[in-house]
A protein has these predicted regions:
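A compositional/biophysical signature of low hydrophobicity enriched in polar/charged and small residues
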Residues: 1-339
Length: 339
């Protein structure tokens, strides 16, 4: 179970972080970069000061380094892919250096052992297949699994004003309206109105910058579930979220074949227990848990996707992703776990 010692993470820390990282949305990440701490507190049944103190704690220990604001992927028809590859551990460092040079790489999540996730952006099926095959070849991958996160559909038009506001908030999504207004040369009222519209239309999302090695008495882990097709994926996902409610910080659902659940666990035995338990659920073909060793974030290297000439002429600011109106938010259920 989660530790309660001073300086260590507990269930409240995890749930507060999950509320900001994903919230109740079915999207892979939160589509509300300005969600109020009061709303989070009310949803969790705690006070607003506790929410602020827990976030300050996550920042203070170095785990949560900041947030980045991006445009909804569906606005450009690009897609994010999370590719899990099993590699030769002796070549991991060289492989990472090679992967960092590839275009469209957003993040590399290195696991303890012989696996890693490579997150990259792709424009179409052809380029997706080409990039995935190249990564697998570079890794000498013995096996791989492709997960394709689904973002909400969005067709809102973005003006130059919207683009400037988004850029001003790119590295600080909670920047004060007055500060943004001064930076972009618009009134605070205009900034507020425009941003509220973008949030309402699900045109933007936030992604955190994290350092898993900074956690004390806990570990970040990735639970990958392969569905068997004998049970609806929604039913399977809800059961997993209910069973692991105290340790899930993010659920990537919507892919017909796989579900990815990011966890924070405090016992190494959970690495064995969780996949064994989840693997016994109806509708699950297999489950595996990998402990995160390191996380390399290359969000700024994606800037080229925002500046391509043909895109800039058609829209004020590009985005990158694939939408799916079919994804439904998993139900939240109160439960306790021992992970």
């Amino acid at each position: 179970m989660c530790l309660r010692e001073r300086g260590k993470l507990d269930r409240i820390d995890i749930k507060v972080f999950r509320s900001l990282l994903q919230g109740e949305s079915s999207a892979p990440l939160s589509m509300d970069p300005r969600r109020s701490f009061r709303a989070i507190a009310r949803n969790l049944g705690i006070d607003e000061l506790t929410v602020r103190n827990r976030l300050r704690k996550l920042h203070g220990m170095g785990f949560l380094k900041g947030w980045h604001l991006f445009v909804n992927p569906s606005l450009l028809g690009l897609e994010f892919v999370e590719l899990l590859v099993d590699v030769r551990s002796s070549s991991k460092e060289d492989l990472i250096e090679k992967l960092r040079l590839l275009p469209g790489i957003a993040a590399i999540v290195e696991h303890v052992g012989n696996s890693m996730y490579v997150v990259f952006a792709s424009r179409d099926e052809g380029s997706l297949e080409k990039q995935a095959t190249l990564i697998e070849q570079l890794a000498g991958a013995k096996s791989s699994h492709r997960l394709r996160p689904r973002f909400p559909d969005c067709s809102v038009g973005l003006s130059r004003t919207d683009a400037e506001i988004i850029r001003a908030l790119a590295r600080d999504p909670r920047k004060m309206y007055s500060a943004v207004a001064k930076e972009v040369g618009f009134s605070s009222k205009t900034v507020k109105r425009r941003l509220e519209r973008l949030i309402e239309e699900k045109a933007v999302f936030v992604i955190p910058s994290m350092d898993p090695s900074a956690l004390e008495g806990a570990m970040v882990a990735d639970l990958l579930v392969q569905y068997s097709g004998r049970e609806g994926t929604g039913v399977v996902n809800r059961r997993i979220l209910s069973e692991l409610d105290d340790c899930v910080i993010r659920a990537v659902v919507g892919d017909p074949d796989y579900g990815l659940f990011n966890l924070i666990i405090t016992r190494i035995s959970a690495v064995r227990e969780i996949p064994k338990r989840v693997g016994s659920f109806a509708g699950v073909a297999s489950a595996r848990v990998d402990v995160v060793q390191n996380r390399l974030e290359m969000y700024h290297d994606l800037s080229g996707l925002f500046e391509e000439p043909e895109v800039s002429r058609s829209r004020a600011i590009p985005a990158y992703g694939l939408a799916s109106p079919e994804v439904r938010a998993p139900e939240r259920r109160s439960s306790k776990s021992n992970w």
